[in-house]
């Protein structure tokens, strides 16, 4: 099953997440199909916290991709900000 989920990056104690479309059987930070955005929970000052390609997200959801709870909330936040 294809899922839209967070893949962790960044340094120790400084998380940075890529929002990726991946097969659910692959590892969290492993192989993915497409990167559709990023989420930086510790953004400071003028740094961007969230960037999401909503058109691609809608495409994948329409084709049966499931979203995790956290990604669903981020999508909702991105739509409200747009």
Curated annotation (Swiss-Prot):
- Judging by the UniProt lineage, the source's domain of life is Bacteria
Return the protein name.
Small ribosomal subunit protein bS16
Q: Which NCBIfam families match?
A: S16 (TIGR00002)
Task: Name a GO molecular-function annotation.
Answer: structural constituent of ribosome
Annotated signal sequence range: none
Q: Would you name any one GO CC term?
A: cytoplasm
Q: Tell me the InterPro entries matching this sequence.
A: Ribosomal_bS16, Ribosomal_bS16_CS, Ribosomal_bS16_dom_sf
What gene codes for this chain?
Answer: rpsP
A Gene Ontology annotation in the biological process aspect, one of them, is: translation
Query: What protein family is recorded?
Result: Belongs to the bacterial ribosomal protein bS16 family.
A Pfam family (short name) is Ribosomal_S16
Q: Which UniProt keywords apply?
A: Ribonucleoprotein, Ribosomal protein
């Amino acid at each position: 099953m294809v899922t839209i989920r967070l893949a962790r990056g960044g340094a120790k104690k400084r998380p940075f997440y890529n929002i990726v479309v991946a097969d659910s059987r692959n590892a969290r930070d492993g192989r993915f199909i497409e990167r559709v955005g990023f989420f930086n929970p510790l953004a400071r000052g003028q740094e961007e916290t969230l960037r999401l390609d909503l058109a691609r997200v809608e495409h994948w959801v329409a084709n049966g991709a499931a979203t995790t709870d956290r990604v669903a909330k981020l999508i909702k936040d991105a739509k409200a900000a747009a």
